[in-house]
């Protein structure tokens, strides 16, 4: 089914500038659901038509197994947005997780993509039931697990996420940069704790929900996951006056790149490797676009580049950059692979 929505042909920078100039209040929310979607193309077209009409922005993944959405909705049209969402059979009763911070526009465009899975997991096991998940944990229960010496708390996020923020005492993925890598290895990583109580967590809940089902599939009996992830944990802690046991920032996959959960700064600048910082930047060299943690001094000295080579490459003529792009990216990937083993705890 083709969408009647007119394609937005503006460049990314043009969309970004338009969003920055739009002074209307917006609300950033995320939601997901594992639900059977028979016709993903029709479902996508339905979402695109309505959400374009409502001027929504965001990044949404649709698959036969469900939906994963991070969105930016006009505040004065949120009730209209919610009423329409709740009227869709696949989405009825869905709950939203609101952003902790709204410092800058979280999204500059609306992108709804059909994917094989709502979260790339690297699994190819027809016997795996993604709906057979572990029980939920509230924020209070999560705190109890953290305080329990017999319980294990495991971070289902990537290493660069855990680097800037994590729960006290959590086991973190020191050299794993994708959920696909981590999920496959999680049963092996946790096998020595198989008979203990295990609590897993992620940003908004979707990754640890699937991970809890995967651990149960691999014989783990007592696996629970934090309902609503770190985002909803922060809300519950604030509303219920609970101790906050999450230290640092919650990394988010939008233009903000993070939400401050506590005042603790637990990461170190990747460039000088001395100054404490938890601010992420993308390398100014668009061929590289490497995500790195930088301090104010290094940002000023390096000009927004993650390495001297990137500054040099960015000064080359456009045609020359196109020629070297493939080889340069291969070099950068190799460099990053080396760096991954040195991120957490630097």
Predicted regions and their residues:
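Structured helix-beta-strand junction loops
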Residues: 54, 148-149
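Rhodanese-like catalytic fold shared by cysteine-dependent sulfurtransferases
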Residues: 2-135, 158-197, 206-346
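Internal catalytic-core helix/loop-beta-alpha segment
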Residues: 134-148
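Substrate-contacting helices/loops that form the catalytic groove of nucleic-acid
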Residues: 203
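Short hydrophobic beta-strand that contains or immediately precedes a catalytic carboxylate
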Residues: 152-156
């Amino acid at each position: 089914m083709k969408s009647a929505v007119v394609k937005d042909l503006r460049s990314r920078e043009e969309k970004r500038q338009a969003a920055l100039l739009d002074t209307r209040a917006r609300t950033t929310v995320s939601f997901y659901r594992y639900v059977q979607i028979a016709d993903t193309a029709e479902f996508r077209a339905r979402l695109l038509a309505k959400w374009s009409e409502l001027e929504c922005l965001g990044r949404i993944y649709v698959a036969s197994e469900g939906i994963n959405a991070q969105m930016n909705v006009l505040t004065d049209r949120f009730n209209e947005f919610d009423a329409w969402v709740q009227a869709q059979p696949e989405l009825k009763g869905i709950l939203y997780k609101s952003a902790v911070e709204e410092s800058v526009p979280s999204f500059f465009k609306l992108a709804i993509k059909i994917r094989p899975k709502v979260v790339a997991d690297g699994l190819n096991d027809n016997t795996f039931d993604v709906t057979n998940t572990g029980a939920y944990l509230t924020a209070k229960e999560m705190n109890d697990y953290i305080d329990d010496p017999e319980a294990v708390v495991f971070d289902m996020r990537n290493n660069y996420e855990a680097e800037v923020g994590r729960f006290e005492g959590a086991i973190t993925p020191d050299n794993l940069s994708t959920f696909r890598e981590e999920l496959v290895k999680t049963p092996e990583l946790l096998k020595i704790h198989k008979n203990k109580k295990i609590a897993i967590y992620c940003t908004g809940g979707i990754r640890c929900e699937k991970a809890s089902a995967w651990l149960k599939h691999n014989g783990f009996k007592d696996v629970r996951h934090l309902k609503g992830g770190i985002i909803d944990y922060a809300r519950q802690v604030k509303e219920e006056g609970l101790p906050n046991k999450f230290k640092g920032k919650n990394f988010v996959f939008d233009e903000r790149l993070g939400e401050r959960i506590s005042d603790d700064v637990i990461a170190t600048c990747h460039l000088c490797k001395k100054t404490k910082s938890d601010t992420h930047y993308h390398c100014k060299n668009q061929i590289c676009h490497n995500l790195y943690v930088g301090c104010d001094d290094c940002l000023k000295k390096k000009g927004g580049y993650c390495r001297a080579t990137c500054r040099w490459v960015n000064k080359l003529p456009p045609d020359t950059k196109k020629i070297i792009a493939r080889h340069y990216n291969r070099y950068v990937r190799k460099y990053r692979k080396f760096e991954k083993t040195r991120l957490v705890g630097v």
